[in-house]
């Protein structure tokens, strides 16, 4: 609910605290926050280029309907955000839900998350200094807080759609694949500049 001036003061406070205490602080791409939509986030990044981001892209993917209106155009628009990601929340959503069971990595929208994560990782690798780190943390939340979906089983009982532990392992594998691809892209870009 913050207007742009209030949000800028929050961003400045985050940047000041991070510098003063030597602790990396990341602003999350999350609904109902100052970085809830791609337009506003990119504008704030332009105004505050030192911001570093926690990319929880499932909120944008579902809330901003990333599958409609040209996914690659949206990727290009959010490039300034992807350049600043230093923490990734590993959750995959679809056009209708922020957190879904992705099976064994076969759902069609997974490719979009692979692209978001790979590009974020590639930017990190190109900019990283010795000792820098990028966190990838699966974040699969409970139906009790309206993230994990529930459906009735054959007996009529409500059951959570997925096993969050198993899904975390799938997300971890996807992230590892993305990191390997990002390393290849980063290495070839650096080699091309040499």
Across the structure, where does each feature detected by a protein language model lie?
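Active-site glycine-centered loops adjacent to acidic/histidine catalytic or metal-binding residues
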Residues: 56
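Histidine-acidic metal/acid-base catalytic patches
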Residues: 42, 47-52, 61-194
């Amino acid at each position: 609910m913050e207007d742009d001036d209030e949000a800028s003061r929050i961003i400045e406070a985050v940047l000041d605290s991070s510098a003063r205490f030597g602790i990396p602080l990341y602003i999350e791409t999350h609904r109902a926050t100052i970085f809830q939509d791609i337009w506003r986030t990119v504008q704030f990044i332009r105004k505050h280029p030192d911001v570093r981001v926690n990319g929880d892209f499932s909120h944008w993917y579902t809330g901003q309907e990333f599958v409609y209106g040209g996914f690659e155009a949206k990727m290009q628009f959010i490039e300034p955000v992807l350049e600043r990601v230093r923490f990734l929340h590993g959750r995959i959503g679809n056009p209708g839900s922020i957190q879904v069971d992705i099976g064994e990595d076969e759902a069609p929208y997974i490719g979009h998350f692979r692209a978001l994560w790979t590009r974020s990782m590639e930017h990190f690798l190109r900019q990283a200094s010795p000792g820098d780190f990028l966190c990838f943390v699966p974040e699969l939340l409970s139906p009790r807080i309206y993230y994990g979906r529930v459906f009735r089983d054959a007996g009529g009982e409500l059951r959570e759609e997925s096993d969050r532990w198993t899904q975390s392992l799938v997300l971890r594998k996807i992230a590892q694949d993305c990191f390997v691809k990002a390393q290849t892209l980063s290495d070839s870009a650096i080699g091309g500049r040499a």
